[in-house]
């Protein structure tokens, strides 16, 4: 375009620009009529006279980042043009706010810092529809907000300047919950006081050194009890073993006596034969053949057996039996008085 063409161009056809600097330090050149749609920028240009050059760019608020500022400029370009119908504006606004919750919050904050009230109202209504019907926990989850309020702060009474009955009922509910919370805190403090350590300094020192004084005493007591219990068990086992040994010895003695007594009928039947002269001569012949030392040994054994038989028979069997009395003749034979039974031959058979 030549200089002559620029000279004949009307002033209204030439666009003027304003220099704006965003939060990240980048500088943009924006049409004046679009930038002036934001009240904050308009005040800076009129009151301070800045923005006419790159060296005197208008610094935008910290909350206005390049991405949000680009969206705001698109909104201003559409709405600052005359001749738009309300239906067109409404359709554009509905499409414009279709974004995620995080970006919608950032856009609301940036529009508020630029004092662009129509855009603030639009984004605020969109956020209101998102949180409608949600409880506090769900709202904190949607906006990723930390729960930094204590239970008491959550239950603080609400201001009711208009005397709303719903707020009155809500404050009553909060008062009841605060009372329950205080009661739980009181019970918790009581439990903590009950668990206070009341041990002496010596016990604490013992615990710090690695051994608890009470635990040591308890362990010693347990060891003593265990030792006594083991001694009782050992003594009872010894008594039981002794009784078993005595019982076995008695049973063995009874068996010996019984085996001896089974020979008594045979001895009784042979009593008459033994008392005859011929039998006596036979015994005398046998006695003559036995060595005198052996005969004396046999006589002592027979006498010991007779004494043991008379003393243990009745006690071991537990029955009353008629004792059998034996005597030893001068020739080494044994005979029974009062029913004289000679047991010389059985004794000889048993010993040999």
Swiss-Prot record:
The gene that this protein is the product of is: ASK20
Bias (Basic residues) ranges = 216-230
UniProt keyword terms in alphabetical order: Nucleus, Ubl conjugation pathway
Source species of the chain: Arabidopsis thaliana
Ranges for the region named Interaction with the F-box domain of F-box proteins are 108-167
Name its GO BP terms in alphabetical order: auxin-activated signaling pathway; jasmonic acid mediated signaling pathway; protein ubiquitination; response to auxin; response to jasmonic acid; ubiquitin-dependent protein catabolic process
Annotated spans, Disordered: 214-251, 267-288
Name used for this protein in its record: SKP1-like protein 20
* GO CC terms, sorted: nucleus; SCF ubiquitin ligase complex
């Amino acid at each position: 375009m030549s200089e002559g063409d620029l000279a004949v161009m009307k002033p209204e056809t030439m666009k003027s620009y304003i220099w704006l600097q965003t939060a990240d330090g980048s500088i943009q050149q924006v049409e004046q009529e679009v930038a002036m749609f934001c009240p904050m920028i308009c005040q800076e240009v009129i009151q301070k006279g800045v923005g006419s050059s790159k060296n005197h760019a208008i610094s935008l608020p910290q909350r206005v980042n390049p991405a949000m500022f680009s969206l705001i400029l698109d909104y201003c370009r559409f709405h600052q043009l005359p001749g738009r119908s309300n239906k067109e504006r409404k359709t554009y606004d509905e499409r414009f706010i279709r974004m995620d919750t995080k970006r919608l919050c950032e856009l609301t904050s940036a529009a508020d810092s630029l004092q662009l009230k129509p855009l603030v109202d639009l984004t605020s209504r969109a956020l209101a529809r998102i949180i409608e019907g949600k409880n506090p926990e769900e709202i904190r989850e949607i906006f990723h907000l930390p729960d930094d309020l204590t239970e008491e702060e959550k239950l603080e009474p609400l201001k009711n300047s208009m005397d709303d009955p719903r707020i009155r009922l809500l404050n009553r509910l909060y008062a009841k919950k605060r009372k329950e919370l205080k009661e739980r805190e009181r019970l918790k403090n009581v439990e903590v006081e009950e668990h206070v350590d009341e041990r002496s300094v010596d016990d604490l020192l013992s615990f710090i050194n690695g051994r608890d004084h009470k635990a040591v005493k308890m362990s010693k007591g347990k060891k003593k009890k265990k030792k006594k219990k083991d001694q009782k068990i050992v003594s009872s086992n010894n008594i039981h073993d002794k009784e078993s040994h005595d019982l076995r010895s008695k049973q063995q003695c009874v068996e010996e006596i019984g085996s001896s007594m089974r020979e008594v009928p045979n001895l009784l039947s042979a009593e008459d034969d033994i008392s005859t002269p011929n039998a006596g001569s036979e015994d005398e012949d046998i006695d003559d053949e036995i060595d005198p030392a052996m005969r004396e040994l046999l006589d002592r054994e027979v006498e010991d057996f007779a004494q043991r038989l008379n003393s243990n028979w009745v006690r071991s069997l537990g029955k009353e039996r008629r004792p059998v009395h034996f005597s030893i003749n001068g020739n080494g034979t044994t005979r029974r008085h009062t029913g004289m039974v000679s047991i010389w031959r059985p004794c000889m058979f048993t010993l040999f």
